[in-house]
Amino acid sequence: MKKIIIAIDSFKGCLTSAEAGKAAEKGIKSINPSCHTSVIPIADGGEGLLDVLITATKGKYITLSAHGPLMKMTKTHYGLSGNGRTAIIEMAAISGLPLVPIEQRNPMLTTTFGTGELIKDASNKGCRNFIIGIGGSATNDAGLGMLQALGFRFLDKSGHTLGTGGQIMEAVANIDTSGIHPALRETHFMVACDVANPFYGPDGAAYIFAQQKGADSNMVQRLDEGMQSLAEVIKKTTGKDITNYPGAGAAGGMGGGLLAFFNAELKPGTELLLKAIDFSEKIKGADLIITGEGKADRQTAMGKVPYGILKEAQKEHIPVIVLAGSIENLPELNKAGFKGIFSIAPGPITLEKAMEPEFAKENITRLVSQLYSVITSFG
Protein backbone atom coordinates (compact mmCIF):
# COMPACT_ATOMS: atom_id res chain seq x y z
CA MET A 1 0.00 0.00 0.00
CA LYS A 2 1.47 3.29 -1.11
CA LYS A 3 -0.87 5.80 0.55
CA ILE A 4 -3.16 5.52 3.57
CA ILE A 5 -5.40 8.34 4.79
CA ILE A 6 -6.30 8.41 8.49
CA ALA A 7 -9.30 10.58 9.40
CA ILE A 8 -10.81 9.52 12.72
CA ASP A 9 -13.39 11.57 14.62
CA SER A 10 -12.70 12.31 18.27
CA PHE A 11 -13.49 9.64 20.84
CA LYS A 12 -15.50 12.09 22.94
CA GLY A 13 -14.20 12.46 26.49
CA CYS A 14 -11.18 10.33 25.64
CA LEU A 15 -9.13 11.26 22.55
CA THR A 16 -9.07 14.16 20.12
CA SER A 17 -9.23 13.45 16.41
CA ALA A 18 -5.51 14.15 16.06
CA GLU A 19 -4.60 11.88 18.98
CA ALA A 20 -6.63 8.98 17.59
CA GLY A 21 -5.14 9.52 14.15
CA LYS A 22 -1.56 9.59 15.41
CA ALA A 23 -2.14 6.37 17.35
CA ALA A 24 -3.38 4.67 14.18
CA GLU A 25 -0.43 6.00 12.20
CA LYS A 26 1.94 4.61 14.83
CA GLY A 27 0.45 1.16 14.24
CA ILE A 28 1.16 1.34 10.52
CA LYS A 29 4.67 2.71 10.96
CA SER A 30 5.51 -0.05 13.44
CA ILE A 31 5.14 -2.52 10.55
CA ASN A 32 6.25 -0.36 7.63
CA PRO A 33 8.09 2.87 8.53
CA SER A 34 8.22 3.93 4.87
CA CYS A 35 4.45 3.73 4.24
CA HIS A 36 3.03 7.09 3.12
CA THR A 37 0.42 8.04 5.72
CA SER A 38 -1.56 11.24 6.12
CA VAL A 39 -3.41 12.06 9.35
CA ILE A 40 -6.30 14.46 8.74
CA PRO A 41 -8.01 15.79 11.91
CA ILE A 42 -11.76 15.67 11.41
CA ALA A 43 -14.99 16.62 13.20
CA ASP A 44 -18.69 17.14 12.73
CA GLY A 45 -20.43 20.45 13.38
CA GLY A 46 -19.94 20.27 17.14
CA GLU A 47 -16.96 19.56 19.35
CA GLY A 48 -13.65 19.95 17.54
CA LEU A 49 -14.84 21.98 14.54
CA LEU A 50 -12.72 24.99 15.45
CA ASP A 51 -9.54 23.03 16.16
CA VAL A 52 -9.82 21.01 12.95
CA LEU A 53 -10.35 24.06 10.74
CA ILE A 54 -7.56 26.02 12.40
CA THR A 55 -5.19 23.11 11.75
CA ALA A 56 -6.39 22.57 8.18
CA THR A 57 -6.12 26.22 7.16
CA LYS A 58 -2.98 26.99 9.20
CA GLY A 59 -5.05 29.60 10.99
CA LYS A 60 -4.83 31.14 14.44
CA TYR A 61 -6.89 31.55 17.60
CA ILE A 62 -8.24 34.92 18.68
CA THR A 63 -8.71 35.27 22.44
CA LEU A 64 -11.06 37.88 23.90
CA SER A 65 -13.68 38.50 26.57
CA ALA A 66 -17.38 38.42 25.74
CA HIS A 67 -20.71 37.97 27.49
CA GLY A 68 -21.60 34.41 28.47
CA PRO A 69 -25.12 32.94 28.45
CA LEU A 70 -26.06 34.83 31.65
CA MET A 71 -24.36 38.08 30.51
CA LYS A 72 -21.27 37.60 32.67
CA MET A 73 -17.98 38.52 31.02
CA THR A 74 -16.15 35.35 30.04
CA LYS A 75 -12.78 34.70 28.41
CA THR A 76 -13.30 32.87 25.14
CA HIS A 77 -11.88 32.42 21.65
CA TYR A 78 -12.65 31.92 17.98
CA GLY A 79 -10.49 31.25 14.95
CA LEU A 80 -9.23 33.01 11.85
CA SER A 81 -8.31 30.99 8.77
CA GLY A 82 -4.76 31.14 7.49
CA ASN A 83 -5.62 33.81 4.90
CA GLY A 84 -7.43 35.88 7.53
CA ARG A 85 -10.64 36.07 5.50
CA THR A 86 -12.79 33.48 7.25
CA ALA A 87 -13.81 33.44 10.90
CA ILE A 88 -14.52 30.11 12.57
CA ILE A 89 -16.81 30.26 15.59
CA GLU A 90 -18.05 27.53 17.90
CA MET A 91 -21.20 28.92 19.48
CA ALA A 92 -20.65 26.65 22.50
CA ALA A 93 -17.40 28.47 23.32
CA ILE A 94 -19.34 31.51 24.58
CA SER A 95 -23.05 30.54 24.59
CA GLY A 96 -22.64 26.90 25.56
CA LEU A 97 -24.44 24.84 28.18
CA PRO A 98 -21.29 23.94 30.19
CA LEU A 99 -20.82 27.66 30.91
CA VAL A 100 -24.00 27.72 33.01
CA PRO A 101 -24.08 25.99 36.42
CA ILE A 102 -26.78 23.33 36.51
CA GLU A 103 -28.84 25.19 39.12
CA GLN A 104 -28.83 28.37 36.98
CA ARG A 105 -29.84 26.84 33.65
CA ASN A 106 -32.91 28.65 32.36
CA PRO A 107 -33.47 29.29 28.63
CA MET A 108 -35.90 32.09 29.47
CA LEU A 109 -32.84 34.03 30.66
CA THR A 110 -29.85 32.71 28.70
CA THR A 111 -28.75 34.66 25.65
CA THR A 112 -26.65 34.34 22.50
CA PHE A 113 -25.33 37.90 22.92
CA GLY A 114 -21.74 36.69 23.27
CA THR A 115 -21.86 34.84 19.96
CA GLY A 116 -22.84 38.12 18.33
CA GLU A 117 -19.86 39.81 19.97
CA LEU A 118 -17.51 37.25 18.43
CA ILE A 119 -19.07 37.83 15.01
CA LYS A 120 -18.70 41.59 15.47
CA ASP A 121 -15.05 41.29 16.50
CA ALA A 122 -14.21 39.14 13.48
CA SER A 123 -16.16 41.44 11.17
CA ASN A 124 -14.15 44.40 12.48
CA LYS A 125 -11.02 42.44 11.55
CA GLY A 126 -12.22 42.26 7.95
CA CYS A 127 -13.85 38.82 7.86
CA ARG A 128 -16.68 38.53 5.35
CA ASN A 129 -17.00 34.75 5.50
CA PHE A 130 -18.02 32.86 8.62
CA ILE A 131 -18.18 29.19 9.50
CA ILE A 132 -20.29 28.76 12.64
CA GLY A 133 -20.88 25.56 14.58
CA ILE A 134 -24.13 25.92 16.51
CA GLY A 135 -24.13 22.76 18.63
CA GLY A 136 -24.12 22.62 22.43
CA SER A 137 -25.93 25.87 23.21
CA ALA A 138 -27.45 26.90 26.54
CA THR A 139 -29.99 29.11 24.80
CA ASN A 140 -33.46 29.25 23.27
CA ASP A 141 -33.62 32.89 22.18
CA ALA A 142 -33.77 32.34 18.38
CA GLY A 143 -30.46 34.16 18.07
CA LEU A 144 -31.98 37.46 19.24
CA GLY A 145 -29.09 38.05 21.64
CA MET A 146 -26.62 37.57 18.82
CA LEU A 147 -28.57 40.07 16.72
CA GLN A 148 -28.69 42.58 19.59
CA ALA A 149 -24.90 42.50 19.80
CA LEU A 150 -24.80 43.28 16.08
CA GLY A 151 -27.00 46.37 16.32
CA PHE A 152 -30.56 45.04 16.09
CA ARG A 153 -33.22 46.34 18.49
CA PHE A 154 -36.29 44.35 19.47
CA LEU A 155 -39.26 46.46 20.54
CA ASP A 156 -42.47 45.64 22.38
CA LYS A 157 -45.86 46.96 21.29
CA SER A 158 -45.24 50.19 23.23
CA GLY A 159 -41.98 50.79 21.39
CA HIS A 160 -39.76 49.98 24.35
CA THR A 161 -36.47 48.17 23.77
CA LEU A 162 -36.54 44.66 25.17
CA GLY A 163 -33.83 42.99 27.24
CA THR A 164 -32.23 39.60 26.64
CA GLY A 165 -33.07 35.90 26.87
CA GLY A 166 -35.73 33.60 25.48
CA GLN A 167 -38.33 35.43 27.55
CA ILE A 168 -38.38 38.40 25.16
CA MET A 169 -39.55 36.46 22.10
CA GLU A 170 -43.22 36.56 23.10
CA ALA A 171 -43.06 40.34 23.53
CA VAL A 172 -41.37 41.30 20.25
CA ALA A 173 -43.71 43.45 18.16
CA ASN A 174 -41.24 45.27 15.92
CA ILE A 175 -37.62 44.85 14.83
CA ASP A 176 -35.37 47.85 14.24
CA THR A 177 -32.54 46.93 11.85
CA SER A 178 -31.25 50.47 11.31
CA GLY A 179 -28.32 49.96 13.66
CA ILE A 180 -27.04 46.80 12.01
CA HIS A 181 -23.28 46.45 11.73
CA PRO A 182 -22.81 47.66 8.10
CA ALA A 183 -20.34 44.98 6.97
CA LEU A 184 -22.86 42.25 7.76
CA ARG A 185 -24.87 43.13 4.68
CA GLU A 186 -22.00 41.74 2.57
CA THR A 187 -21.13 38.77 4.78
CA HIS A 188 -21.77 35.08 4.13
CA PHE A 189 -22.47 32.59 6.92
CA MET A 190 -21.95 28.85 6.52
CA VAL A 191 -23.65 27.20 9.49
CA ALA A 192 -22.78 23.69 10.64
CA CYS A 193 -26.12 22.21 11.64
CA ASP A 194 -26.72 18.52 12.24
CA VAL A 195 -30.44 18.61 13.06
CA ALA A 196 -33.41 19.33 10.80
CA ASN A 197 -35.90 20.58 13.39
CA PRO A 198 -38.32 23.35 12.36
CA PHE A 199 -38.44 26.67 14.21
CA TYR A 200 -41.38 25.81 16.49
CA GLY A 201 -44.05 23.17 17.04
CA PRO A 202 -43.89 19.60 18.42
CA ASP A 203 -40.57 18.98 16.65
CA GLY A 204 -39.30 22.53 17.09
CA ALA A 205 -36.59 24.09 19.20
CA ALA A 206 -38.46 24.45 22.48
CA TYR A 207 -40.25 21.11 22.65
CA ILE A 208 -37.24 19.06 21.56
CA PHE A 209 -34.28 20.83 23.16
CA ALA A 210 -35.31 23.36 25.83
CA GLN A 211 -35.78 20.87 28.65
CA GLN A 212 -32.13 19.79 28.53
CA LYS A 213 -31.23 23.47 28.89
CA GLY A 214 -33.17 23.83 32.14
CA ALA A 215 -36.74 24.55 31.02
CA ASP A 216 -39.76 23.14 32.85
CA SER A 217 -42.98 22.29 30.99
CA ASN A 218 -44.41 25.79 31.46
CA MET A 219 -41.25 27.39 30.08
CA VAL A 220 -41.27 25.03 27.10
CA GLN A 221 -44.81 26.11 26.22
CA ARG A 222 -44.00 29.82 26.62
CA LEU A 223 -40.85 29.50 24.54
CA ASP A 224 -42.69 27.69 21.76
CA GLU A 225 -45.49 30.27 21.74
CA GLY A 226 -42.88 33.02 21.74
CA MET A 227 -41.23 31.50 18.70
CA GLN A 228 -44.56 31.28 16.88
CA SER A 229 -45.17 34.96 17.56
CA LEU A 230 -41.61 35.91 16.64
CA ALA A 231 -41.80 34.01 13.33
CA GLU A 232 -44.74 36.21 12.31
CA VAL A 233 -42.85 39.40 13.20
CA ILE A 234 -39.81 38.17 11.27
CA LYS A 235 -41.99 37.43 8.24
CA LYS A 236 -43.50 40.91 8.46
CA THR A 237 -40.04 42.50 8.74
CA THR A 238 -38.03 40.47 6.22
CA GLY A 239 -40.57 38.69 4.04
CA LYS A 240 -38.95 35.38 5.00
CA ASP A 241 -40.98 32.51 6.44
CA ILE A 242 -38.49 30.44 8.44
CA THR A 243 -41.13 28.35 10.22
CA ASN A 244 -40.53 24.99 8.55
CA TYR A 245 -37.03 25.47 7.20
CA PRO A 246 -35.00 22.36 8.18
CA GLY A 247 -32.60 23.38 10.93
CA ALA A 248 -34.35 26.64 11.81
CA GLY A 249 -34.94 25.21 15.28
CA ALA A 250 -31.31 24.22 15.81
CA ALA A 251 -29.53 25.65 18.86
CA GLY A 252 -32.72 27.10 20.32
CA GLY A 253 -33.69 28.78 17.05
CA MET A 254 -30.23 30.16 16.30
CA GLY A 255 -30.47 28.54 12.87
CA GLY A 256 -33.64 30.48 12.19
CA GLY A 257 -32.18 33.75 13.43
CA LEU A 258 -29.23 33.47 11.05
CA LEU A 259 -31.44 32.47 8.11
CA ALA A 260 -33.90 35.30 8.72
CA PHE A 261 -31.51 38.22 8.68
CA PHE A 262 -28.30 37.19 6.92
CA ASN A 263 -26.94 35.51 3.82
CA ALA A 264 -26.72 32.17 5.59
CA GLU A 265 -26.68 28.52 4.59
CA LEU A 266 -27.29 25.59 6.92
CA LYS A 267 -25.24 22.51 6.09
CA PRO A 268 -24.64 19.18 7.84
CA GLY A 269 -21.50 19.65 9.90
CA THR A 270 -19.52 16.80 8.35
CA GLU A 271 -20.37 17.90 4.80
CA LEU A 272 -19.39 21.48 5.58
CA LEU A 273 -16.09 20.52 7.18
CA LEU A 274 -15.03 18.06 4.48
CA LYS A 275 -15.63 20.74 1.88
CA ALA A 276 -13.81 23.40 3.91
CA ILE A 277 -10.65 21.28 4.23
CA ASP A 278 -10.82 20.13 0.58
CA PHE A 279 -11.02 16.49 1.67
CA SER A 280 -11.88 15.18 -1.80
CA GLU A 281 -8.53 16.44 -3.12
CA LYS A 282 -6.55 15.16 -0.13
CA ILE A 283 -7.69 11.56 -0.63
CA LYS A 284 -6.93 11.28 -4.35
CA GLY A 285 -4.61 8.35 -5.03
CA ALA A 286 -5.13 6.75 -1.61
CA ASP A 287 -5.24 2.95 -1.30
CA LEU A 288 -7.15 2.91 2.00
CA ILE A 289 -8.93 5.26 4.39
CA ILE A 290 -9.08 4.54 8.11
CA THR A 291 -11.84 6.40 9.93
CA GLY A 292 -13.65 5.89 13.21
CA GLU A 293 -15.43 7.28 16.25
CA GLY A 294 -16.14 6.38 19.85
CA LYS A 295 -19.32 4.43 19.12
CA ALA A 296 -20.30 2.98 15.76
CA ASP A 297 -24.05 2.35 15.50
CA ARG A 298 -26.99 2.96 13.19
CA GLN A 299 -26.44 6.74 13.54
CA THR A 300 -23.01 6.26 11.96
CA ALA A 301 -24.68 5.38 8.66
CA MET A 302 -27.03 8.38 8.91
CA GLY A 303 -24.58 11.21 8.33
CA LYS A 304 -21.94 11.06 11.06
CA VAL A 305 -18.27 11.60 10.26
CA PRO A 306 -17.39 8.06 9.06
CA TYR A 307 -20.35 8.04 6.67
CA GLY A 308 -19.42 11.43 5.23
CA ILE A 309 -15.92 10.12 4.62
CA LEU A 310 -17.31 6.94 3.05
CA LYS A 311 -19.37 8.95 0.55
CA GLU A 312 -16.29 10.92 -0.55
CA ALA A 313 -14.17 7.76 -0.71
CA GLN A 314 -16.69 5.94 -2.87
CA LYS A 315 -16.35 8.63 -5.54
CA GLU A 316 -12.67 7.63 -5.81
CA HIS A 317 -13.29 3.89 -5.27
CA ILE A 318 -11.21 3.88 -2.08
CA PRO A 319 -12.03 1.24 0.58
CA VAL A 320 -12.88 2.53 4.06
CA ILE A 321 -12.54 0.74 7.40
CA VAL A 322 -13.93 1.95 10.73
CA LEU A 323 -12.38 1.78 14.20
CA ALA A 324 -14.67 2.24 17.20
CA GLY A 325 -14.70 1.89 20.95
CA SER A 326 -17.97 -0.04 20.73
CA ILE A 327 -20.10 -1.36 17.88
CA GLU A 328 -23.86 -1.81 17.48
CA ASN A 329 -25.98 -2.76 14.44
CA LEU A 330 -23.02 -4.25 12.56
CA PRO A 331 -25.13 -5.58 9.64
CA GLU A 332 -26.46 -2.07 8.91
CA LEU A 333 -22.95 -0.65 8.96
CA ASN A 334 -21.68 -3.31 6.57
CA LYS A 335 -24.65 -2.66 4.30
CA ALA A 336 -23.72 1.04 4.16
CA GLY A 337 -20.53 0.16 2.31
CA PHE A 338 -17.74 0.06 4.88
CA LYS A 339 -15.21 -2.69 4.17
CA GLY A 340 -14.82 -3.51 7.84
CA ILE A 341 -15.80 -2.25 11.28
CA PHE A 342 -13.46 -3.11 14.14
CA SER A 343 -13.64 -2.54 17.90
CA ILE A 344 -10.43 -1.34 19.52
CA ALA A 345 -11.37 -3.07 22.79
CA PRO A 346 -8.95 -5.93 23.58
CA GLY A 347 -11.59 -7.85 25.54
CA PRO A 348 -14.17 -7.38 28.31
CA ILE A 349 -13.30 -4.12 30.10
CA THR A 350 -15.10 -1.44 32.09
CA LEU A 351 -16.14 1.77 30.37
CA GLU A 352 -13.91 3.67 32.79
CA LYS A 353 -10.88 1.65 31.69
CA ALA A 354 -11.81 1.94 28.01
CA MET A 355 -11.95 5.74 28.35
CA GLU A 356 -8.39 6.06 29.67
CA PRO A 357 -6.59 8.02 26.92
CA GLU A 358 -3.29 6.12 27.00
CA PHE A 359 -5.10 2.77 27.07
CA ALA A 360 -7.25 3.81 24.10
CA LYS A 361 -4.19 4.94 22.13
CA GLU A 362 -2.43 1.63 22.80
CA ASN A 363 -5.50 -0.28 21.62
CA ILE A 364 -5.77 1.72 18.40
CA THR A 365 -2.06 1.24 17.67
CA ARG A 366 -2.26 -2.51 18.36
CA LEU A 367 -5.36 -3.03 16.22
CA VAL A 368 -4.09 -1.00 13.26
CA SER A 369 -0.72 -2.77 13.25
CA GLN A 370 -2.53 -6.12 13.07
CA LEU A 371 -4.92 -4.92 10.35
CA TYR A 372 -2.06 -3.52 8.30
CA SER A 373 -0.16 -6.81 8.55
CA VAL A 374 -3.17 -8.79 7.35
CA ILE A 375 -4.07 -6.41 4.52
CA THR A 376 -0.54 -6.17 3.13
CA SER A 377 0.05 -9.93 3.37
CA PHE A 378 -2.30 -10.31 0.40
CA GLY A 379 -0.17 -8.01 -1.70
Where are these regions (language model features)?
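N-terminal loops that bind phosphate or other acidic moieties
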Residues: 2-134, 138-379
